[in-house]
Structure formats: C-alpha cells, structure tokens
C-alpha cells in the first residue's frame, strides 16, 4: 500500500523549508522514515516477505546517505531532524 497522498502532503507541509519545497533533505528523509515505519509494521505480520525486506534495506541505506549528507552540510539541521523524527544517530 504505502503512504497515502494525504499523509504525504502532511509530511511535506510539516518538514518543508520554504513554500514550494518538496526535495530538501529534511522532506526526503521524513518521507523515507514514514515508508520505513510502514514496512516495519508490514513485516510484523508478513515475516516471509523477503522481496519487500530487500526494498526496506535499500531504503534504510538511502536514508542513511541523506542523513550523512545533511550532517556534513549543516549539523544543526541534522540534530533537529534526528530529534523530531526520533531516529538513532
């Protein structure tokens, strides 16, 4: 299923940096975190869904790359985002 369009708009609205922002690292990381949380719940009931598990691992790696990029360019924004999404460093 994934993220509903309404939920996606909510996330973009809450994490955007300016009025037409959809691609900033904060928005991308927030959307990825939402998808990761959805897939994590999915695996609690579908333990043998290895195909989707591979997608989850790739998604986590992509989010980690974006987090490292954000940490490199602006540690303050990185810290706020980590705290706001309540994810590990």
Swiss-Prot record:
Against Gene3D superfamilies, the record matches this protein to:
6.10.250.3130, S15/NS1, RNA-binding
Which InterPro entries is this protein grouped with?
Answer: Ribosomal_uS15, Ribosomal_uS15_bac-type, uS15_NS1_RNA-bd_sf
Biological process GO annotation list? Answer: translation
Molecular function terms from GO: rRNA binding; structural constituent of ribosome
Protein keywords: Ribonucleoprotein, Ribosomal protein, RNA-binding, rRNA-binding
- Under the cellular component aspect of Gene Ontology, which terms does the record hold? cytosolic small ribosomal subunit
The signal peptide annotation in the UniProt record is none
Q: Which residues form a coiled coil?
A: none
| Complex and partners | Part of the 30S ribosomal subunit. Forms a bridge to the 50S subunit in the 70S ribosome, contacting the 23S rRNA.
Q: Which family does it belong to?
A: Belongs to the universal ribosomal protein uS15 family.
* Protein function: One of the primary rRNA binding proteins, it binds directly to 16S rRNA where it helps nucleate assembly of the platform of the 30S subunit by binding and bridging several RNA helices of the 16S rRNA. Forms an intersubunit bridge (bridge B4) with the 23S rRNA of the 50S subunit in the ribosome.
Q: What is this protein called?
A: Small ribosomal subunit protein uS15
Q: Which gene encodes it?
A: rpsO
